[in-house]
Amino acid sequence: MSALRTHYTDEAEFVRRVDDVQRPEGYRIVGAFEGERCVAVAGFRVIHNLAWGDTLYVDDLSTLPETRGRGYGRALLEWCKEEGRRRGCIQFHLDSGVGPEREEAHRLYFNTGLRIYAYHFAAPLE
């Protein structure tokens, strides 16, 4: 996950944030492994809202750079979709940043059946 969320430089703070804030909101992490080494992770939660209904939302999807292209991201996305079905969700969503460095990820998303259905707008509140 540190390859994706580079602003967390302190491992203990990252773990605290996941355990104390994310997990109580239903956040879970699953991984893909090469032997004993975790090479890809997906962080997800089930959300409920009036616009989408029950939705499995992927907050985080990250594969170590040296293991990209081996199918780990695809496998995790497919697992998450199936988990959403198991939990009775009717939608599967994720947001992705934009820019040339995201093209490989976007290709994966399109190739796994995801489509762009909305713009996600944001502004800092500082």
Model-derived regions: residue spans:
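A short, internal acetyl-CoA/4′-phosphopantetheine-binding micro-motif in the GNAT/acyltransferase core
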Residues: 48, 61-68
